[in-house]
Amino acid sequence: MVVKVLFFGVLAEISGTSFKHYQDVRSIGDLKLRIQDDFPEIVHYVFRISLNSEITDNDLVLKEGDVVALMPPFAGG
């Protein structure tokens, strides 16, 4: 199973890319651990996670083709 992770803002700078594919992850929590293994400095940043354009939590199960976005805090006005 492959999921696509999108990185935005400072998270894209840390990862050096705007997206990366991850295989064999079962949940958002598992995916976060894999991302932290790949980019250890990411643990120092606050970010929100969306799954297929919906803000989510760690307990959701991932499916083939899901798109996960990591988004730093943002302000609007």
Regions found by a protein language model. Give the residues of each.
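Ubiquitin-like/PB1-type beta-grasp interaction modules and other compact soluble beta-rich domains
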Residues: M1-G76
